[in-house]
Design a protein with these regions (language model features):
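Hydrophobic, Leu/Ile/Phe/Ala-enriched alpha-helical segments that form helix-helix packing faces
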Residues: 52, 87, 149-153
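Active-site-proximal, Lys/Arg-enriched surface segment
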Residues: 62-122
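Short, positively charged, Gly/Tyr-enriched micro-motifs
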Residues: 24-72
Length: 379
């Protein structure tokens, strides 16, 4: 049996059980795309196609993939929602962090905006949308996605806190979070004007000395909008080694804990790294149509979920299992990388057990792997 067929068999039973469709080929070809992504560690269609165990020309295999990516009968959210329902079935008492961020693909033609769930000091995809062009995005572009996520998540978790960077600093984002019943922690620019409860108004960076933490309660944000919020401020070191202010607005009490919570947002940047050079090379996709990118992300998301699931499996087996793929005496690989390397070693050597995909994750909290001191905020 080919290694690709091994992976197919381990994905097949659970995905067909969760996503029943009349046309079985929709799921069959979906699984082959997932297999190709895992095998090739790439989102390039020719490389995905090269991993499919079919005695056909390369062009035919790529055509099969393209047809699935363009198939309007493949409903991305209904397919993926069924999987997420299974993944989150035991999370009803959990307060979760959702992380909103964007990444450019195909140069600057497309932006993928993704809501991800913090898991094991990384993040797994929950929902995404593709927007043409670059630059800051307005709240109306992503509102329907966030409302969809809210309707889904409220059935499976206790409370949601949304973390976002300064690309989402407009007051509209914070206001939408409150409408959705979510807490929020959003980074703002250091030159933002705030008005204190006593009526004093000035730029935020004029209030906070370098390398000092400050916490402001019940301030009004910006000169125009006057959003009432709380602000937590700390400092980190930028790429040039200079002090850089980190200011976070939140509906909760401004305090040190808010800064620690926001540090969780780094998980999504590292997870996009898993999608790109550290894993599946998403940035180099040459797809030019939003629908095809949307479908590709459906395959990539299942690949990511399985890697997280395998990472959990390895940690549950103990240090002896981790040391088979992680050469350090302490963990230096993310949950995603542990899972991906275990999968690759199984396919290469056949020496270790590879469990079937179960679409099951625990509310795992892990300490981060080693991070250079220069990247750590003063929290």
């Amino acid at each position: 049996m080919s290694s690709s067929q091994e992976l197919y068999n381990r994905l097949n039973e659970k995905l067909r059980e969760m996503v029943p469709v009349k046309n079985r080929k929709q799921v069959t070809n979906w699984i082959w795309v997932i297999v190709g992504i895992l095998q090739s560690e790439s989102c390039n269609l020719s490389q995905i196609g090269n991993c499919l165990p079919m005695d056909t020309k390369a062009e035919s295999r790529v055509t099969l993939i393209r047809r699935w990516l363009s198939n309007s009968q493949v409903k991305v959210w209904p397919f993926y929602k069924k999987v997420l329902e299974h993944v989150l079935s035991g999370w009803s008492s959990v307060e979760v962090y959702l992380i909103l961020d964007g990444v450019m693909v195909f140069g600057d033609r497309w932006q993928i905006f993704r809501v991800s769930l913090c898991h094991g000091c990384r993040a797994i995809p929950i929902a995404w949308t593709i927007v043409e062009g670059n630059g800051l995005v307005k709240v109306n572009k992503l509102k329907s996605m966030l409302e969809k996520v809210q309707r889904f998540m409220k059935r499976y978790v206790k409370q949601v806190s949304l973390l976002a960077d300064a690309g989402f600093r407009d007051c509209d984002w914070a206001q939408l979070c409150r409408e959705l019943g979510w807490n929020y922690a959003i980074r703002i620019a250091c030159n933002t004007y705030i008005t204190l409860p006593d009526g004093t108004s000035d730029r935020l960076d004029n209030w906070v000395p370098v390398n000092c933490n400050r916490y402001f309660q019940n301030v009004l944000l910006t000169r125009e909008t006057k959003l009432q919020t709380n602000v937590s401020v700390t400092w980190t070191i930028d790429e040039k080694g200079q002090p850089e202010m980190v200011a976070i607005i939140t509906n909760q009490i401004a305090c040190r804990a808010r800064l620690r919570e926001y540090a969780t947002r780094m998980s999504i940047e590292q997870s996009f790294g898993d999608d790109k050079s550290g894993g599946f090379d998403l940035a180099h996709t040459r797809l030019q149509h939003a629908q095809r990118i949307d479908h590709l992300l459906l395959g990539l998301s299942i690949a990511t979920l399985w890697c997280h699931e395998l990472g959990e499996f390895i940690l549950k087996q103990g240090e002896s299992a981790r040391c088979l793929i992680d050469p350090s005496h302490e963990r230096t690989l993310s949950l995603f990388q542990l899972g991906l390397r275990w999968l690759k070693r199984f396919l290469t050597t056949g020496l270790h057990f590879l469990p079937d995909f179960q679409a099951c994750l625990s509310n795992l909290r892990l300490k981060p792997v080693v991070i250079p001191i220069s990247q750590k905020p003063n929290v």
